[in-house]
């Protein structure tokens, strides 16, 4: 097993995004009606109103996909002999892309407090990508 510090940190950061996106994605699946109603109440007065339902499903699909992708990355770092896992690289990039979409949506809805709550996740993903780049790409 690979227990060097950088692998452990990258594995834990991968698990962080598994938990973050899996919980959110599962919640959207289990409580679809309530979450969709919330999306409609938040974005109903914006230019996104005609496409709220497809956007809701798109975000849900991305959250579930990224959480699965990051689970593979965590496995690579914590349970395999992988010292450099391409799943981690793309996982952090996909996480950042999803977080930027969520941030943009909050800004469009003029929920500035909600948008500011996403910033720590974006910073965490940026730090994780930086660590990955320095550990595996140098």
What kind of feature is each model-predicted range?
Residues 1-27, 57-138:
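Extended, low-polarity transmembrane helix blocks
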Residues 20-62:
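Solvent-exposed, well-ordered loop and adjacent helix/strand elements within mature globular domains
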């Amino acid at each position: 097993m690979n227990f060097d510090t950088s692998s452990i940190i990258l594995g834990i950061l991968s698990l962080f995004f598994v938990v973050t996106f899996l919980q959110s994605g599962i919640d959207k699946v289990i409580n679809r009606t309530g979450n969709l109603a919330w999306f409609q109440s938040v974005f109903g007065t914006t230019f996104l109103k005609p496409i709220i339902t497809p956007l809701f499903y798109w975000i849900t699909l991305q959250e579930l996909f990224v959480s699965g992708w990051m689970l593979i990355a965590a496995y690579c770092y914590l349970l395999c002999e992988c010292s450099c896992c391409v799943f981690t690289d793309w996982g952090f990039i996909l996480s950042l892309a999803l977080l930027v979409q969520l941030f943009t949506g909050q800004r469009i809805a003029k929920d500035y407090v909600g948008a500011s709550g996403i910033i720590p996740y974006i910073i965490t993903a940026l730090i994780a990508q930086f660590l990955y780049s320095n550990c595996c790409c140098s």
